[in-house]
Amino acid sequence: MDRARTETGELNRFFNWAYRTRGNTVKALAEGKMMSPEKMFLSFTSHDPVFISNGPEGLNGSVKGIGFIPKDEYLEEALAAYVEHIKSYDPEDKTYSDRGLKLLIKWLYSEEAEKTIDFEHIYSVEMAFKHSYANYKANPEATLLFYQPPMLSFEVRGKMEIIGEHHEIGTADPFSLPLIQQFINAQHDVYHLPNIERWVSRPAYKFTVEEIFDNSANKIGFGTKIPF
């Protein structure tokens, strides 16, 4: 059985929150539903944990965006769909982001897509190349800390792997990068302003989940370990 799921087959409470909160927001946007700013901002807490690291730059915490991706055997097909969409970008085309949302639903957040998701890992891209980057190059131990006011909080411990290198734009072929580095950057660009040439400057983070704790201020939290 998938370690992210309980004995009933349901996602455990961390993944149910982290994956489905983001997915529900994407679906709502794709359907044109209005979301209050407060609800929108709260939904981002499942996407923007604090990355905790410790190394030559000292004990550090940095807020970064995260995401889930399909398992290895589905990546090439999904990447091809992403790239086809990205290459269709036209500054005058106001439908680009809406079409991107539909792609994200197809490959990440549909009922069928959920069966293909890699819940063993959490992914991100590096854009700053300061404290976190230096620390993870020296020491892969990492904790991701999530907090949604007023009381929900999860602590996820594991190991961080840096996929790819930080190249100057124009010095490397984006399509020669490691598959995961291409995919994470493409997944970002499916909705946001795309720039394929920029991918070479943004290595990916692959965080292997080892332990999950519910630190929420409620009767099932306060450091309770979630089976995984």
List where the protein language model places each region.
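Binding-site signature for planar aromatic cofactors or substrates
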Residues: 1-228
